[in-house]
Design a protein with these regions (language model features):
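A phosphate-binding catalytic loop at a beta-strand-loop-alpha-helix junction
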Residues: 89-109
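Cysteine-based protein phosphatase catalytic domain of the PTP/DSP
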Residues: 2-94
Length: 109
């Protein structure tokens, strides 16, 4: 599915097969998440908590962009979580709170 299926204020892009990067609005659109086959969500934001814990597997990365050292401490856990989601045949959304920032791209496989 294309990111054009999302509301105008939402943004997500499939960066590699079955791995999406998006903002918090994409992560709150339950219908879109299900439509594109998301099964695992990496929430790279200290500001919010997982919204659908009974419907998707979550990895909550509670960090802020300005904590560069802390970002690197999560890379192995994020990669393992993404790999597991893909191994199980699912799709993964990695999302941030507001804008695409280094914390999301750093953690991508």
């Amino acid at each position: 599915m294309a990111s054009s299926d999302l509301p105008d204020w939402s943004e997500a892009h499939e960066i590699i097969d079955r791995v999406w990067v998006g903002n918090v609005f994409a992560a709150t659109d339950n219908a879109w998440l299900k439509r594109v086959g998301i099964t695992h969500i990496v929430c790279a934001a200290a500001e919010i908590v997982p919204l659908f814990p009974l419907e998707f597997a979550y990895l909550w990365v509670r960090i802020y962009d300005w904590e560069a050292d802390e970002v690197m401490s999560w890379v192995d856990r994020v990669r393992a979580f993404v790999d597991r989601g893909l191994e199980l045949g699912g799709s993964v959304l990695i999302h941030w709170y507001r804008l695409p920032r280094g914390r999301v791209v750093t953690s991508c496989p």
